Amino acid sequence: MTQRKIIHIDCDCFYAAIEMRDEPELAGKPLAVGGSAERRGVIATCNYEARAYGVRSAMSSRHALKLCPDLTIVKPRMEAYKEASREIHTIFRDYTDLIEPLSLDEAFLDVSDAGHFSGSATRIAQDIRRRVSNQLHITVSAGVAPNKFLAKIASDWKKPNGLFVITPDQVEDFVASLPVTKLHGVGKVTADKLGRLGIVDCADLRGRSKLALVREFGSFGERLWSLAHGIDDRPVQNDSRRQSVSVENTYDTDLPDLAACLEKLPALLETLGNRMARMEGQYRPGKPFVKVKFHDFTQTTLEQSGAGRDLGSYEQLLAQAFARGAKPVRLLGIGVRLHDLRAAHEQLELFSQ
């Protein structure tokens, strides 16, 4: 089997970088992109000058200004960011068609069969970084590795504006020293449970059998075992089929109780219906879900198999989700999981051959 060559590209503070490029007087000063503090806005991203003060994405703009009183907050210009992302992807396509976008500013590339630079993934990554810098006047960080799990870790290793390569013969030693918190899918709860078992890094994980990990963590235990051994067979998928469709709204004033939340549902449901109508014939709607973010930024999502997608069904889901926190609400969202009709059609064609 041919050794895979995967590149993970991650733009450095992308939205903020575009703003500093287009408004040079913003460069070198603490800058964030997000909503205004007066309208209960949230930080989408910030530059490294702002991060030095502790400002982070998903933080309320009001709190960010407390940490950094000189912080400049600008409104997002999504069309500018989308255009920059399109330009970057045009560069990607000069090297491979196997591109898996994760967001506007992040993507995996499989260059295993690329002929550029005699097939050197490292030189391809260097050239992509050079071209993005020259054409868009922003920087990107890149990670090169034999799989997606390691390529993503590598791109973060020398941020910002860095390149880090993990060759196949380095995988064993590199992964052994990785803390379990670096593993894809390991959040605080799983990390705490691993810690109680005396598992701090991947070397510790390797000391446990696959069966023992499955007993402790269910099917995710098998995934943990694979990652601890540097194994990740997930392909780079350039299929943009959707998993769900949703709509959400952050309110200027907290919704104080369930009744106030329920009043907002009809408008959300109307918008959701319009979005679903645009996808008719491509997807079959599945489970409905609701998302509630409380005033203290804790949030919960609830979905239910077999439930309808009418107002009454969403009201029941919202009531259950609200009860989990029973606090004032700053954001409400509703949505539907989707089943791809094109995939089902392709399967029928396959079995009919």
Swiss-Prot record:
Active-site residues, as the UniProt record annotates them: 106
Swiss-Prot/TrEMBL site (Substrate discrimination) positions: 15
Residue ranges of every copy of the UmuC domain listed in the record: 6-187
A Pfam short name: IMS_C
PROSITE patterns documented for this protein: UMUC (PS50173)
Cofactor binding note: Binds 2 magnesium ions per subunit.
Cofactor: Mg(2+)
Reactions catalysed, as given in the entry: DNA(n) + a 2'-deoxyribonucleoside 5'-triphosphate = DNA(n+1) + diphosphate
Keyword match Magnesium: yes
GO biological process: DNA-templated DNA replication; error-prone translesion synthesis; SOS response
Main localisation: cytoplasm
UniProt entry tagged with the keyword Secreted: no
Record-level Gene Ontology MF annotations: damaged DNA binding; DNA-directed DNA polymerase activity; magnesium ion binding
Enzyme Commission number(s) from the entry: 2.7.7.7
Cellular component annotations (GO), alphabetically ordered: cytosol
Keyword field: Cytoplasm, DNA damage, DNA repair, DNA replication, DNA-binding, DNA-directed DNA polymerase, Magnesium, Metal-binding, Mutator protein, Nucleotidyltransferase, Transferase
Residues bound to Mg(2+): 10, 105
Localization, UniProt: Cytoplasm
Positions of transmembrane segments: none
Family: Belongs to the DNA polymerase type-Y family.
Function: Poorly processive, error-prone DNA polymerase involved in untargeted mutagenesis. Copies undamaged DNA at stalled replication forks, which arise in vivo from mismatched or misaligned primer ends. These misaligned primers can be extended by PolIV. Exhibits no 3'-5' exonuclease (proofreading) activity. May be involved in translesional synthesis, in conjunction with the beta clamp from PolIII.
Subunit: Monomer.
Protein name, entry field: DNA polymerase IV
Lineage per the UniProt record: Bacteria, Pseudomonadati, Pseudomonadota, Gammaproteobacteria, Pseudomonadales
